[in-house]
């Protein structure tokens, strides 16, 4: 939970 956008960055 934290990085759920684009580009898909780690949490």
UniProtKB/Swiss-Prot annotation:
Alphabetical keyword list: Hypotensive agent, Metalloenzyme inhibitor, Metalloprotease inhibitor, Protease inhibitor, Pyrrolidone carboxylic acid, Secreted, Toxin
Keyword hit for DNA-binding: no
Positions bearing Pyrrolidone carboxylic acid: 1
Gene Ontology annotations of biological process type: regulation of blood pressure
Tissue note: Expressed by the venom gland.
A GO CC annotation given for this chain: extracellular region
Listed GO MF terms: peptidase inhibitor activity; toxin activity
Subcellular location: Secreted
Chain's role: Bradykinin-potentiating peptides both inhibits the activity of the angiotensin-converting enzyme (ACE) and enhances the action of bradykinin by inhibiting the peptidases that inactivate it. It acts as an indirect hypotensive agent.
Family listed: Belongs to the bradykinin-potentiating peptide family.
Name the UniProt record assigns to this protein: Bradykinin-potentiating peptide 11
Organism: Bothrops jararaca
């Amino acid at each position: 939970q934290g990085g759920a956008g684009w580009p898909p960055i780690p949490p």
